[in-house]
Regions:
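Structural/interface elements that position substrates and couple domains in central-metabolism enzymes
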Residues: 1-313
């Protein structure tokens, strides 16, 4: 989980020969604190004549997969230069097309801002996921509990799931934990909770499978609903659902599994099944991702349902 800025370094080295006085150099990639300053040193080491004559800044992207082009224009942006002149130069550039508000700061604060945004989400999701673990032991419906708790005007608990995925929220907290391990206890623990939730879901599926075998004298057929890292997208990066499916299928070639992901046509590892086939033929139906396609189908009553994402809440 150590940060790797080699791609930022490689990209910077590629453009160094082409930089000219007056140019504006901007990093948008999520990066550890101090990366912009490191790239400044890298540039000046190769091109000392540019020192004080180019503008270097950091402006993290804030976009939602599936809605990128709109959010590039509409969302507020945080922009931090290595000095005030660089900040103002970058603000002038982004103001040409960004309709959201543009907020100026310094490079280190802008870098940390991006990490904090995603780490904050991770911590909040970890609280919801931890509640789901507690409620499972306490025989409480976690979805009802959260709905009732959120009736309080100053409470806003997020929804639990089968973990946290994607190439942002599941990754960015490590940039803070790696550099400040003693000071980031909550952030680090949140990562552990969210990773554990995926393992816990896989164990719940295995336990339900064994219960079915004991009750019926045969192995169940199991539908695993969803592979994407969040609802209604086709992105599988760092997906907890994909981890769970891999773990459940591991060393179990005798059982019949129906893997459903409506947002992709095929997968290089998993054989995909149509939802309508899976929901009819499976004995156990496991909801891993809250895709709209799953919400729009009626649940068949004679199935064993494991709902980790609130499809039936």
């Amino acid at each position: 989980h150590e940060p790797d800025i080699s791609f930022v370094e490689a990209a910077t080295e590629e453009i160094i020969p082409f930089l000219k006085k007056g140019n504006l150099y901007i990093i948008e990639s999520t990066s550890p604190i101090g990366t912009t300053e490191k790239m400044q040193k890298l540039i000046y080491a190769s091109r000392p004549e540019l020192e004080g004559h180019i503008h270097i800044a950091y402006c993290p992207e804030r976009v939602l997969p599936g809605n990128i082009m709109l959010e590039l224009v509409e969302n507020d942006r945080v922009i931090g230069g290595v000095d005030e002149a660089a900040t103002q130069k970058a603000i002038s550039f982004y103001s040409k097309y960004v309709k959201g508000e543009v907020h100026g700061t310094n490079a280190r604060t802008a870098e940390m801002c991006k990490l904090v945004e995603n780490s904050s989400r991770d911590v909040q999701i970890a609280f919801a996921n931890e509640l789901s673990l507690i409620c499972d032991k306490a025989d409480i419906n976690v979805w009802e509990l959260i709905n009732l708790a959120n009736k309080h005007p100053r409470v806003n608990i997020l929804q639990p799931g089968c973990g946290v995925g994607g190439h942002c929220i599941a990754v960015d907290p490590y940039f803070i934990v790696s550099d400040y391990p003693m000071e980031s206890k909550i952030i680090g623990t949140a990562r552990e909770v969210n990773n554990y939730k995926s393992f816990w879901c896989a164990e719940k599926i295995q336990n339900e499978k064994l219960k079915f075998e004991l009750a019926h004298g045969r192995k169940p057929s199991i539908a695993l609903m969803g592979l994407a890292f969040k609802p209604n997208i086709d992105d599988l990066r760092e997906s907890p659902a994909k981890y769970i499916v891999n773990r459940v299928l591991q060393n179990d070639s005798n059982s019949e599994y129906f893997i459903v992901e409506p947002n992709i046509d095929s997968h290089n590892v998993f054989k995909l099944t149509n939802y309508n086939v899976a929901i009819v033929d499976a004995d156990i139906v496991v909801y891993l991702v809250a895709h709209e396609e799953f919400k729009n189908h009626k649940i068949i009553n004679d199935k064993v349902i494991l709902d980790f994402c609130g499809i039936n809440k």
